[in-house]
């Protein structure tokens, strides 16, 4: 029994390493309207990420988060399918379907930032500036890596657009643990 406990504890430690606990601070801050998308929407679910073998259904959470953030800020909807096509045409993806962040920043109107530190400070600063941070989480707190878009805070919780869910979720659904923070926002030209 002790052996099983030790193995379980070791696995849990390895799954959670590298993440930071982040909690919402300050008053409620809600968007006028949160644009939500699902990565598995049949209109784009089978679209490939660039020239890779990966599809929006399997690996499109990040693109869906970016599409949501840009749609909220630009006051013009851009779907994950449309954004994926734009990213593919502009060589934003590497051969494995990973986003090359510098390539996004070279596209007219798009700005991208990769934070070296993962803390609530970066998330709060993004929200206060009217931007929507993208955070890497683990599904159900312990599962595979996944990206969600933080769209605001309410009652001491961060509200998230999860591209695998129909409704807004909270960061506590992922253990309040973030493994990376990214930001893509739209600047009018």
Task: Label each PLM-derived region with a short phrase.
Residues 33, 70-189:
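Conserved active-site-adjacent core of cysteine acyl-enzyme catalytic domains
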Residues 1-90:
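Active-site-adjacent structural segments surrounding the nucleophilic cysteine of cysteine proteases
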């Amino acid at each position: 029994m002790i052996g099983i406990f030790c193995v379980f504890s070791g696995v849990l430690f390895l799954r959670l390493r590298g993440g930071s606990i982040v909690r919402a601070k300050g008053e409620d801050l809600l968007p006028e309207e949160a644009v939500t998308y699902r990565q598995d929407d049949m209109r784009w679910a089978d679209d490939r990420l660039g020239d890779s073998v990966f599809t929006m259904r399997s690996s499109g959470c990040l693109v869906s988060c970016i599409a949501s953030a840009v749609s909220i800020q630009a006051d013009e909807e851009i779907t994950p399918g449309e954004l994926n096509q734009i990213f593919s045409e502009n060589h934003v993806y590497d051969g494995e379907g990973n986003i090359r962040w510098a390539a996004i920043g070279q596209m007219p109107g798009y700005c991208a930032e990769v934070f070296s530190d993962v803390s609530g400070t970066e998330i709060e600063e993004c929200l206060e500036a009217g931007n929507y941070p993208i955070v890497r989480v683990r599904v159900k707190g312990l599962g595979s890596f996944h990206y969600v878009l933080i769209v605001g805070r309410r009652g001491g919780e961060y509200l998230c657009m999860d591209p695998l869910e129909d409704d807004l979720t909270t960061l506590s659904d992922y253990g309040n643990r973030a493994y990376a923070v990214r930001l893509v926002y739209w600047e009018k030209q």
